């Protein structure tokens, strides 16, 4: 008995000591900016390690399942036995379908990605769900589906960062920054491009550049890139050889033209993905079998693609002979079409992954094809297919993924040629403007739109959703029966005793607001004993719902031209649950906006 008591006391002491150390760490990371920067670096190391491990696992799967040589990329157009090309995606689809069906039984909520987490939930993500997404991405890509691993990199990195930040109980904005650090580390490790990883976090995951986020995100991206360099012998996933490519001022209009055309291709790819999802959703088969059906289609497309993948990757087609150049251009056009279809089918049937890698590949093909066609029609222009491949690659990724400056830095870091920057910057801007004007969404925000979410970026709109009327309203409001006499009302509610009184009917439902200035008007003194309150009510049809956010409430106040409105539970029962004044709603709204401004400027560390 004494031994058990001693063990119990010891375990309590250990637990108490751990709690004290955790509390101390929480204070340090909340109070010290340098400590938070180091925390971001730790997140970058973890994300870079996860991305490197995932990349190696997928590479091993390619070597084992498709029978390619060690260190050879499956996307390099190497010869693969035809039966492997057909059967591996089908088998992979069956395995993925079984995994998704099994995980769905234990998952009670929808998976939240880093963009949605930062936009709505203040950076909160589930680590188990994120690891599940990473596993599904590896199964999809490893079995030959035309999807990118970047979705898995950012999901796993963001999930680990969110879990760590939640354990340390960091502030809402700091948690959003940590999720951005996880994404930055993963992308930087994948492409060995720390600047691209950092701006991926700024533009796509955090939703904007801020002083407070600069140091932790950049340190995280650098840490992820260093980890990948130490653990991986492979080059970047899409190596494109460029060397000191000159800038041609006389071809500037052609650069803008290829950017606009590439943006149109990117829009078509996104629409094709949506159409594919709808077609697979309409199939009368189990969702677990749809990846296998899509895998069969992808295998057939891959079989045709590999017959002409070598000439497609020959981006110097314009330097070939006339007949050879035509064959190269035809091969590039065929691969462009088949790769687009394969990506649309892969995502539509349920394979897990993104369009980042596909957008880079398709963009490079589009640029090389454009340069080859122009050189064939106008030999005197002598466009460099490699330069136009890089330009179009950046434009396509800016259209599909978003984040124009992410793609500028990615292209520069992948090629090592800063002379391309003056051409890439205007091209990605043209592509982004074209996509915004003609389509209005990136691939991620387009999927949010189809789901009914009003998310256009990772900007934090969750605080608006959390600041609801139910949280702002006052519940101790006075009520009166609508059939009461004015004289009784004046007796029960003397002038100055209340700011407003809500009238309800015999069933307790909202009837209107009694304006006190009207109830105590001098012209009603003689008729007070015979006048009922129903004749004096205002705002009979203007009410607030407890589920409204503060922005919707302010808009309702403006439309009703009211200083205060009653809050009802729903529009059917109309039972009064509280009252809210416009002045208080505006004060809280402005207070939250000021808090967001302070976080953006990094002032929260010193407050």
Please report, for each region that a protein language model flagged, where it lies by residue.
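Alpha-helical transmembrane segments and immediately membrane-proximal extracytoplasmic
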Residues: 1-466, 470, 475-489, 498-501, ...
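Hydrophobic, well-ordered secondary-structure elements that form the walls
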Residues: 353, 402, 430, 472, ...
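Short hydrophobic beta-strand motif reused across regulatory alpha/beta modules
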Residues: 409, 511-519, 577-585
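Bateman (tandem CBS) regulatory domains
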Residues: 454, 464-477, 484-485, 515-518, ...
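The conserved cystathionine-beta-synthase
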Residues: 480-498, 504-505, 521-526, 530, ...
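Flexible loop/coil segments at beta-strand boundaries within sensory signal-transduction domains
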Residues: 506-509, 571-575
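Juxtadomain coupling helices with adjacent low-complexity linkers
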Residues: 582-607
């Amino acid at each position: 008995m004494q031994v058990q008591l001693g063990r119990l006391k010891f375990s309590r002491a250990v637990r108490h000591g751990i709690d004290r150390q955790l509390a101390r760490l929480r204070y340090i990371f909340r109070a010290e900016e340098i400590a938070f920067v180091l925390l971001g670096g730790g997140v970058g190391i973890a994300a870079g390690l996860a991305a490197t491990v995932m990349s190696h696992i997928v590479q091993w799967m390619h070597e084992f399942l498709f029978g390619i040589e060690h260190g050879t990329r499956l996307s390099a157009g190497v010869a693969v036995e035809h039966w492997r090309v057909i059967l591996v995606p089908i088998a992979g689809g069956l395995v993925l379908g079984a995994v998704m069906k099994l995980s769905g039984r234990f998952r009670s909520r929808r998976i939240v990605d880093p963009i949605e987490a930062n936009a709505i939930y203040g950076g909160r993500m589930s680590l188990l769900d994120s690891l599940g997404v990473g596993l599904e991405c590896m199964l999809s890509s490893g079995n030959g589906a035309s999807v990118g691993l970047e979705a898995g990199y950012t999901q796993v990195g963001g999930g680990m960062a969110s879990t760590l930040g939640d354990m340390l109980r960091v502030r809402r904005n700091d948690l959003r920054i940590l999720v951005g650090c996880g994404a930055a580390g993963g992308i930087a490790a994948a492409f060995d491009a720390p600047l691209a990883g950092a701006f991926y976090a700024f533009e796509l995951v955090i939703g904007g550049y801020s002083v407070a986020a600069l140091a932790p995100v950049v340190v995280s991206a650098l840490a992820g890139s260093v980890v990948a360099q130490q653990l991986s012998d492979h080059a970047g996933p899409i190596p494109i050889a460029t060397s000191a490519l000159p800038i041609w001022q006389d071809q500037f209009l052609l650069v803008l033209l290829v950017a606009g055309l590439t943006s149109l291709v990117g829009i078509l790819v996104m629409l094709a993905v949506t159409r594919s999802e709808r077609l697979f959703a309409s199939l009368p088969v189990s969702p677990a079998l749809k990846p296998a059906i899509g895998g069969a289609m992808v295998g057939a497309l891959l079989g045709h693609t590999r017959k002409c993948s070598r000439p497609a990757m020959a981006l110097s087609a314009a330097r070939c002979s006339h007949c050879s150049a035509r064959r190269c251009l035809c091969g590039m056009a065929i691969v462009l079409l088949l790769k687009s279809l394969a990506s649309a089918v892969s995502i539509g049937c349920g394979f897990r992954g993104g369009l980042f890698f596909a957008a880079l590949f398709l963009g490079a093909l589009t640029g090389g094809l454009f340069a080859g066609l122009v050189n064939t029609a106008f030999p005197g222009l002598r466009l460099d297919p490699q330069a136009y491949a890089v330009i179009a690659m950046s434009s396509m990724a800016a259209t599909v993924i978003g984040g124009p400056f992410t793609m500028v830095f990615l292209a520069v870091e992948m090629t090592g040629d800063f002379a391309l920057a003056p051409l890439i910057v205007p091209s990605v801007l043209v592509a982004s403007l074209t996509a915004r004007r003609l389509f209005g969404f990136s691939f991620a925000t387009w999927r949010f739109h189809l789901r009914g979410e009003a998310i256009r970026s990772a900007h934090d709109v969750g605080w608006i959703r959390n600041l609801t009327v139910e949280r702002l309203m006052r519940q101790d409001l006075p009520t009166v029966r609508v059939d009461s006499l004015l004289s009784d009302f004046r007796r029960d509610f003397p002038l100055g005793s209340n700011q407003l009184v809500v009238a309800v009917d015999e069933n307790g439902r909202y009837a209107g607001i009694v304006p006190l200035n009207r109830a105590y008007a001098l012209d009603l003194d003689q008729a007070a004993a015979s006048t009922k309150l129903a004749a004096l009510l205002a705002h009979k049809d203007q009410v607030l719902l407890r589920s409204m956010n503060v922005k919707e409430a302010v808009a309702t106040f403006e439309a009703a031209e009211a200083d205060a409105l009653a809050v009802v539970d729903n529009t059917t029962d109309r039972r009064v649950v509280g009252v809210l004044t416009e002045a208080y709603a505006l004060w809280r709204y402005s207070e939250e906006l000021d808090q967001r401004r302070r976080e953006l400027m990094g002032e929260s560390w010193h407050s």
